[in-house]
Amino acid sequence: MTVFKHIAIIGLGLIGSSAARATKAYCPDVTVSLYDKSEFVRDRARALNLGDNVTDDIQDAVREADLVLLCVPVRAMGIVAAAMAPALKKDVIICDTGSVKVSVIKTLQDNLPNHIIVPSHPLAGTENNGPDAGFAELFQDHPVILTPDAHTPAQAIAYIADYWEEIGGRINLMSAEHHDHVLALTSHLPHVIAYQLIGMVSGYEKKSRTPIMRYSAGSFRDATRVAASEPRLWQDIMLENAPALLPVLDHFIADLKKLRTAIASQDGDYLLEHFKESQKARLALKTDHDIRP
């Protein structure tokens, strides 16, 4: 059972609204206060009964909280932290849910130097966003990565781990640097590819003035599903994780050039071996938990 009695959730998109629902479902004794900068989102949160209190004042939301869960875009973390800082209790724990860790941790530490911060990243989601997109089961059996540093109190880490486990998550610990490299490979690069692929095909369609995408089969739809994700959110992620993403992107481009060379030179042996190795890796992935991005 979580030790937290009052949780404030800042940002009510997919992750924030799901955390609110999950907290109410699995931690019914916890008071949940909610804040989002959007009046429309706040009104939807009230209509959906996502929390005990939905406020238009971020300081009111966090004033009594012993856990503040930050579910805002990574480039909004600093603004949010500065806005809520004067109202925070001394012993409150701050936990972000961002997809980038190194830069976000620095931003939070700069703005909240006297508070305990336990960075986290639930590896759960869909291409949908907003308070209506969330659901209480989102985190069930999905990894939640915690990236504390040497100065993070062990008790605070345990409290945050217990909370995520209470609402369904599976805890993993790693350094912030390793997290950003891993996510550049497994999440951020796939989003780059999805946005670029559907953008390229759409461009072909517009230029040729002939229908193309109406003939897309399952492979195209699967490969581009995450391009339906919120663009501004992913703009922030790409820019904030550029130090980890750019080398990964360079590696991908180099490998793509090798494939092009093999196709141009009719090197079937290279293609077959490459496809076999890739198939083997994908089939092995199916035996583990299939994580939504």
From Swiss-Prot:
Catalytic reaction(s) noted: L-arogenate + NAD(+) = L-tyrosine + CO2 + NADH; prephenate + NAD(+) = 3-(4-hydroxyphenyl)pyruvate + CO2 + NADH
SUPFAM superfamilies from the UniProt entry: 6-phosphogluconate dehydrogenase C-terminal domain-like, NAD(P)-binding Rossmann-fold domains
Entry EC no(s): 1.3.1.43, 1.3.1.12
Activity's dependence on pH: Optimum pH is 6.6 for both activities.
Sites where the protein binds NAD(+): 6-30
Keyword Kinase tagged: no
Top-rank lineage group of the source organism: Bacteria
One annotated GO biological process: tyrosine biosynthetic process
KW Amino-acid biosynthesis (keyword) present: yes
A molecular function GO annotation: prephenate dehydrogenase (NAD+) activity
InterPro entries assigned: 6-PGluconate_DH-like_C_sf, NAD(P)-bd_dom_sf, PDH_C, PDH_N, Preph/Arog_dehydrog, Prephen_DH
Function statement: Can function as either prephenate dehydrogenase or as arogenate dehydrogenase in the biosynthesis of L-tyrosine. Catalyzes two analogous reactions: converts prephenate to 4-hydroxyphenylpyruvate and transforms L-arogenate to L-tyrosine. Is not able to utilize NADP(+) instead of NAD(+) as cosubstrate.
UniProt similarity note: Belongs to the prephenate/arogenate dehydrogenase family.
Assembly with partners or alone: Homodimer.
Protein name (database record): Cyclohexadienyl dehydrogenase
Organism expressing this protein natively: Zymomonas mobilis subsp. mobilis (strain ATCC 31821 / ZM4 / CP4)
Species classification: Bacteria, Pseudomonadati, Pseudomonadota, Alphaproteobacteria, Sphingomonadales
